[in-house]
Amino acid sequence: MAPETKGQRSISHFFKSQSSSQKLNKDDTEYSGNIIDLTNGDEKVSSRLANFEHKPNKSSKSPNELDTSKRKSSKDNEHVDGDPEPVKKKPRTSQSLSRSKSKPQSVGSNSKKLTPLEKQFVEMKQSNLDKILAIQVGYKFKFFGEDAVIASKILSIMLIPGNIKLDEYQHDRFAYCSIPDNRLHIHLKRLLNQGLKVGVAKQTETAAIKSIDSTNKSGLFEREITGVYTKATYMGDELLTGDPNINRTSITDDEMGDYIFCIDESHSKDIGMIAIQPITGDIIYDTFNDNVTRDELETRLVYLNPSEILVINNSTEISKETIKMINIVNNKVNIIHRPRRQQTDYTNEIYNFFNTIDEGKYKDLGEHYLLKFPNNIQSCMIELIKYLEEFKLSNIFTIISNVSCFSNSKTCLVLPSSTVQALEIFQNMTDPNSNKGSLIWLLNHTRTRMGNRLLVKWISKPLIDKAQIEERLQGIEDLTFKFNHFIDSLKNQLDKIGKASIDLEKNLIKVHYSSTYQLDKISRKEVYLLLKCFDDILSMIKQFGKPTNNILESIHSPLLLRIFDELMQLAKEDTVRCLLDMISADALDDSNLNDQKIKFFNLNYFKDQQIISQLSEISNVESLLNDELIEIRKMLKRPQLNYITSSKETYLVEVRNGKMVDSLPKDWIKINGTKTVSRFRSPEITRLHKQLQYHNDMLIRNCDKAFNAYLFKIDNNYEFFSKIIRNLSTFDCLLSLSAVSSINSNYARPKIVEDKQIIQMKNSRNPIIENLSVNYSNYISNDINISYDEDRVLIITGPNMGGKSTYVKQVALLVIMAQIGSYIPCDEATVGIFDSIFIRMGARDNILQNQSTFMIEMLECSHILKNMTSNSLIILDEIGRGTGTNDGIAIAYSILNYLIEEPRKPLTLFITHFPSLHVLEDKFKGIATNYHMGFHEVSKSNQEFPEVVFLYNLVRGVVGNSYGLNVAKLAGIPNSIINNAYTKSTEIRDAIESDWPKKLIKMIKSLREQNDARVELLEIEQLCNNID
């Protein structure tokens, strides 16, 4: 067997997972994390088929049952691949795979038993061992051998038994399964969602071309791999295969699109990273210093959530720290190791790539990347280029306007992964498959997919530049409170794009890929709709003409004015109109895909000599066929005779059965017939018909070439179209934020200050809880007052479930909304600009990293203390609860004391169930202040514990009782247990109170002797916990 190639273990991993009892079915979306090591090219695949036995599912469909279209093959589509279907032969059971008594034989002595198609498969497979191959055979796609076993299991389709391995000859054919070609897209996505790489091999010649041009007229059809896909690189390409009438807009592809990562960890702390998103063309790079726990890497993985990761380093394997972190974030990601090479290799390859792609069109970009980016970014870049070449996507790096830095400290802040998760920015943590209850769920009212993607970026990276924040806020005010005909018309255009499910951003990048590599990633209809959307928008802007400037006098937002001004300038150009004039939109209404191709171009504006030449040849042949028809009319004495078409067979002469048929020349060929008539072609018609088919097929080829040339023209104007998309996306995001303040009542524009850290809000509300509540009127609002000058640290106590966590999350969410440029739920607000927001909240452990709850708690605190600034907002929830009470109090006190005395002086909200920490208010008056969540205690008889009514309002003071027994009651703990606990709690409290004088004297002695401050704090906690 051939040596292992890139990614090969992704297939062997599937068999391994089967033998280790991982069961896959049609509802599975991924399998466990897969590490692919490319350093050992000689290692062979170990698929462990001995442990895998295919068991047909009762619901599995046979290959013929799947072909619901029941299309009937014409002679034009016949093939001579020698791949017989088991029609009359009784199929063997799956057990026959293992029970066959035939002995394995050598390849050389048995290769003659393979059909021509199977030999072709073996040749393809030997050079593509890392892929599942789907091979086109007529109107079907077939999987053979190991590929068939995997495909049949995932797709729940029948497996026809046979040989599994390439060098196995126990049976007279390979095991196989098949799917109809018009269902390829659907089945392909299911395979890709299992983390597999799939190659699609198509027939590259037709019967007509083969019969005239081919040197081997009776041999095998030529096939080649026309597309290779993974989950991140597939963009609905194969929707073009099969049924031309399929409604592409009715099939929802992943709207956001997966990222592909490359990380250079050659230097353990100085890490370089590039992430590309094929569906949009986004390229995100970053360099950062990281620690052993890979906190910075985790943040980037959480934000971008890649499905494929390449890791470069100087070792023979990926570092344990990186592997652990990747598996924590996503244990289903495919991971590929790349050994680091000499830097000169990367430099030379970058130069070579840009000098050769598109005939040197982008040769200057090599110098640009080498001068602008450090070595560890250059290495990531070239490894991604090499990786993407197989998918024909590496020209993504030719669009430098799509390149951005992940952490741009001058314009935005990056929320740490712990903050993103704690605040549920993008995902509801109780239901990871839903975003309901997340910040994106609240703010996302975008009309288009491109607007949706941009809004996600806005939310993930709040602004730290006051001018940019104010521009967005003013834009929302203009859109919310002022009616404008121009703005209303532009809104309607976005609505049309959204309702039609047209993804301008995705389709434009597909044009770019296709123009360079001559791919079929985008259909003619998609191209037309793309241009038509641009034309409608620019034409609408033109219709306003000169009065546009007067209309925009009511707009005060510099951001909106820039958007409209740039769109007006772009509307003056005739680029879109010229491109639309070259095509005929009426052709797209034709249900026949080939007719669409032939009629697509308006040859008056798009002059292609090859198309014109083939059309002329076709016209000549059709004229000769008409001449032949005249001669046949004379011969048969039927002046009204015409050619007919039957079962897709054209140019047939229909004759009644009987004497008329008997009188025909013997060299006439019968094509088909019925009981009453027979249909023939004369030798001359047969000859001309073959010529006509040949020229028609050549015309289709030339139309495809012309279409690629047309895509190249569009791609030459990529930046023009990209500017339109960027402006429309920004406008869509502003409309979305405007909708938030319109749909929800009592939202206010925050006053942004940059000279001091402050959060002052009157009657503020948690925007998520407010929208999830059934009765809005019952929601309790709270004031927020925290600033650098006064009450910089809030120490918050109160009963369990009293609303402490909800309150501090509310503070963080409102700050983020303000810095996004959104209105916020309150009467009025003044907010400073924060460059970082750190949150340590919740109890969780990490088995993968052998880390306990307390270890994670301390690691996150350590990260916060190291990275905070004087412009940070810090929220700490119940620090110290992951360990014993004594150590927990000491840790909580020390951390809080450090945050108060630290010269960087961040604003801090500190939730605790250790009421003894309230002493810090006396120690640091005006800096630290005690607050608690309001409640009302309802006393009962001495035998029962008091009930608590939560008021959910923040009030001054400290609370010593957490009222945990009330939570136990809500959880359904039996009353007898709760009453017993209350009795015990009362006894302990009475014992402590009776011992108070002795404890006080001991504490004073301890202080006089200057013992450890921790002794003091522990004594205070134990004595005051029940006395306060």
Curated annotation (Swiss-Prot):
SUPFAM superfamilies referenced in this protein's UniProt entry, alphabetically: DNA repair protein MutS, domain I (SSF55271), DNA repair protein MutS, domain III (SSF48334), P-loop containing nucleoside triphosphate hydrolases (SSF52540)
Keyword Nucleotidyltransferase in record: no
Location of region: Disordered: 1-114
Binding residues annotated for ATP, in chain numbering: 798-805
Domain of life assignment: Eukaryota
Listed Pfam families: MutS_I (PF01624), MutS_II (PF05188), MutS_III (PF05192), MutS_IV (PF05190), MutS_V (PF00488)
Composition bias type Low complexity, residue spans: 10-23
Principal localisation: nucleus
Comp. bias regions, Polar residues: 93-113
GO-annotated biological processes: gene conversion at mating-type locus; maintenance of DNA repeat elements; meiotic mismatch repair; reciprocal meiotic recombination; removal of nonhomologous ends; replication fork arrest
Gene3D superfamilies: 1.10.1420.10, DNA repair protein MutS, domain I (3.40.1170.10), MutS, connector domain (3.30.420.110), P-loop containing nucleotide triphosphate hydrolases (3.40.50.300)
Disulphide linkage map: none
GO CC annotation terms, alphabetical: MutSbeta complex; site of double-strand break
Mispair-binding domain, as annotated region: 109-232
Basic and acidic residues bias spans: 41-56, 67-88
Keywords on record: ATP-binding, DNA damage, DNA repair, DNA-binding, Nucleotide-binding, Nucleus
Compartments it resides in: Nucleus
Function: Component of the post-replicative DNA mismatch repair system (MMR). Heterodimerizes with MSH2 to form MutS beta, which binds to DNA mismatches thereby initiating DNA repair. MSH3 provides substrate-binding and substrate specificity to the complex. When bound, the MutS beta heterodimer bends the DNA helix and shields approximately 20 base pairs. Acts mainly to repair insertion-deletion loops (IDLs) from 2 to 13 nucleotides in size, but can also repair base-base and single insertion-deletion mismatches that occur during replication.
Subunit structure: Heterodimer consisting of MSH2-MSH3 (MutS beta). Forms a ternary complex with MutL alpha (MLH1-PMS1).
Family affiliation: Belongs to the DNA mismatch repair MutS family. MSH3 subfamily.
Name of the molecule in the record: DNA mismatch repair protein MSH3
Organism: Debaryomyces hansenii (strain ATCC 36239 / CBS 767 / BCRC 21394 / JCM 1990 / NBRC 0083 / IGC 2968) (Yeast)
Gene: MSH3
